[in-house]
UniProtKB/Swiss-Prot annotation:
Binding-site positions, Mn(2+) 1: 268, 345, 347
Function, as annotated: Presumably involved in the processing and regular turnover of intracellular proteins. Catalyzes the removal of unsubstituted N-terminal amino acids from various peptides.
Protein name per the record: Probable cytosol aminopeptidase
The entry's keywords: Aminopeptidase, Cytoplasm, Hydrolase, Manganese, Metal-binding, Protease
Cited Pfam families: Peptidase_M17, Peptidase_M17_N
Binding-site residues for Mn(2+) 2, renumbered to this chain: 263, 268, 286, 347
This protein's GO CC annotations: cytoplasm
One of the GO BP terms on file: proteolysis
NCBIfam families noted in UniProt: PRK00913.1-2, PRK00913.1-4, PRK00913.2-2, PRK00913.2-4, PRK00913.3-5
Molecular function terms, GO-annotated: manganese ion binding; metalloaminopeptidase activity
Protein family according to the UniProt entry: Belongs to the peptidase M17 family.
Main subcellular localisation: cytoplasm
Length: 498
């Protein structure tokens, strides 16, 4: 992964080197250790704040070169706004602000993890460190020539805390979680000639090093299972399909697992119903759901989560050739239900149909959550700030909404109902794979619901959040890694053994 920042924790008494970072509120007040570290430079800070009209607003930063009275070569004062308003996600964002101030080349950074009232808690300092790593991620593997102002970053960030041991303990699961997010980002950012189904499966299989059980289904295995919906999508590509089943057994032996299913269309041309050429290159990211599931499984295994989990991803390419699926074809899914193909560019739901059915019937999970860059319609409805949430279970939907608000990876519940079924009724088969333009994200979810049977289930349409979403305080990457933090928190809060 393109991780260019190392983060560690040191005692508050550590002398600052290179760049010194402190925090202040809207009154420009800092904590006692911060004031001690600043020494006589406090006056220089006040003058600079007045000159630049720095007010200590949340996320605002005052950058001072060679501050008088300090051995540090740079001083950055970051505003926190009103301390009483700070929530967990705000510390991630503050960490992102730190990362945004890092220069190119080697740089030593000391951060005083302190609020005006005193030291940050271990959890707050851990979130700060995670925010630094999330923002600092960069994907530039294929650039052979870099501009002078785009030199490689090699920063060492030392976060000064009151209790080093407790903060390290709090950061350990956060560190694995950031690794999981960055794995998901890396997968989404890779070009499609590099990351095709077999290569994706190979990378997912590397989770075995963390104790994750791996099963890879090739085309003969899926043919034997009668996964006709998934294989129909894949038949136009020279790159054979794969389905990868990942299992983490961290809970009680024999306890039913929870399950996460990801759409993994490694490149989507639309097939015979071919897409316009403009922005087709973005369809390398049509496997954002599968990338999230792999990143999530890494995060859970890295912290040895006390829960049994299944992660399943269907990996295909949707390509046009003489053997490609045609509009008008009828395929038989693993469930035995038949599907008339109206539009070959409505392929993700076909992939998910077979993988959802496989997981529901073979592993009998307590619930399933699927993630998919499924419809452009969800972007019309929600833009790029929220993922669409569809569910047949109110408790699961409520929990997803709550952890979305806590992590900043927000969801918005959309309707399901039998009234929408008529849009996907077929004259020739049990159903067709797309309806009218109206309510397109809803009818896609309504289609998926036919393949979960009675299993509690939620569908996250992440077309607007997984890739090319707006850059934020903690993400500057085209592939955002959306969903890893959301689902990790869902598991930790509601489903792990305490």
């Amino acid at each position: 992964m393109s991780d260019v920042v190392s983060v560690g924790f040191v005692p508050m008494s550590t002398s600052a080197k290179g760049l010194l970072v402190v925090f202040c509120d809207e009154t420009l007040a800092s904590g006692p250790d911060s004031r001690k570290a600043l020494g006589t430079a406090v006056d220089a800070v006040k003058r600079a704040a007045e000159t630049s009209r720095f007010k200590g607003k949340s996320g605002a930063a005052l950058d001072i070169l060679a501050p008088e009275g300090l051995k540090a070569s740079r001083l950055v004062v970051i505003g926190i706004g009103k301390p009483a308003d700070l929530k967990e996600h705000d510390f991630l964002k503050l960490g992102g602000t730190i990362a945004s101030k890092l220069g190119s080349g080697k740089e030593a950074v000391t951060v005083i993890a302190e609020l005006p009232a005193g030291p940050m808690s271990p959890a707050q300092a851990a979130a700060l460190a995670a925010g630094v790593r999330l923002r600092a991620y960069k994907f530039d593997r294929y650039k052979t020539k870099k501009k002078d102002d785009d030199a490689p970053l090699d920063a060492s960030v030392a976060i000064a805390v009151r209790d080093v041991a407790a903060t390290k303990k709090a950061f350990a699961p956060q560190n694995g979680l950031v690794d999981g997010v960055n794995i998901a980002r890396e997968l989404v950012n890779e070009p499609p000639n590099v990351l095709y189904p077999a290569e994706f499966a190979r990378r997912a299989s590397q989770l075995s090093k963390l104790g994750v059980g791996i099963e890879v289904l090739d085309v003969p295995a899926m043919t034997k299972l009668k996964m006709g919906a998934l294989l129909g999508v894949a038949q136009g590509s020279a790159r054979p399909a794969r389905t990868v089943i990942m299992r983490w057994n961290g809970g009680k032996k024999g306890a039913a697992p929870i399950a996460f299913v990801g759409k993994g269309v490694c490149f989507d041309t639309g097939g015979i119903s071919i897409k316009p050429s403009a922005s087709m290159e973005d369809m390398k990211g049509d496997m954002g759901g599968a990338a999230c599931v792999v990143g999530l499984m890494h995060a859970l295994a890295a912290r040895k989560a006390k829960v049994n989990v299944i992660g399943a991803i269907g990996l295909v390419e949707n390509m046009p050739d003489g053997n490609a699926q045609r509009p008008g074809d009828i395929v038989t899914s693993m469930s035995g239900q038949t599907i008339e193909i109206i539009n070959t560019d409505a392929e993700g739901r076909l992939v998910l149909a077979d993988v959802l059915w496989y997981v529901a019937k073979k592993h009998k999970p307590k619930f399933m959550v699927d993630l998919a860059t499924l419809t452009g319609a969800i972007m019309v409805a929600l833009g790029t700030e929220y993922a669409g949430l569809f569910s047949n279970n109110d408790e699961l939907a409520t929990r997803l909404n709550e952890v979305g608000l806590a992590t900043g990876e927000r969801v918005w519940r959309m309707p399901l109902g039998p009234e929408y079924d008529k849009q996907i009724d077929s004259q020739f088969a049990d159903m067709k794979n797309t309806g009218s333009r109206n309510g397109g994200s809803i009818t896609a979810a309504q289609f998926l619901q036919r393949f979960v049977d009675d299993t509690p289930w939620a569908h996250l349409d992440i077309a607007g959040t997984a890739m090319a979403s707006p850059k934020s305080d903690i993400n500057q990457s085209w592939g955002s890694g959306y969903g890893v933090r959301l689902l990790d928190r869902l598991v930790a809060t509601h489903y792990e053994s305490k």
